[in-house]
């Protein structure tokens, strides 16, 4: 998700999205550990999106 669509969301929606991203990050990590992750760039993508959401949450306070 790009930054423009994230900025349009409310703080509650961002928090819910952050929870979903954390779950996805856990899933991607487990796939990496077990050797079942075909797209290794997903680790980086999820980590950066979490950073974007946390940045927006911090700036809205």
Curated annotation (Swiss-Prot):
> What GO terms in the biological process aspect are recorded for it?
translation
Q: Which domain of life is it from?
A: Bacteria
Q: Name one Pfam family in it.
A: Ribosomal_L29
In its UniProt record, a GO molecular function of this protein is:
structural constituent of ribosome
InterPro entries recorded: Ribosomal_protein_uL29 (IPR050063), Ribosomal_uL29 (IPR001854), Ribosomal_uL29_CS (IPR018254), Ribosomal_uL29_sf (IPR036049)
Which terms are listed as keywords in the entry? Ribonucleoprotein, Ribosomal protein
Family designation: Belongs to the universal ribosomal protein uL29 family.
Instruction: Write the protein's name.
Output: Large ribosomal subunit protein uL29
What species is given as this protein's source? Stenotrophomonas maltophilia (strain K279a)
């Amino acid at each position: 998700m790009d930054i423009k669509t994230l900025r349009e969301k409310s703080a509650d929606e961002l928090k819910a999205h952050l929870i979903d991203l954390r779950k996805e990050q856990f899933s991607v990590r487990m796939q990496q550990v077990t050797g079942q992750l075909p797209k290794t760039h997903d680790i980086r993508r999820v980590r950066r999106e979490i950073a974007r959401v946390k940045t927006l949450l911090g700036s809205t306070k």
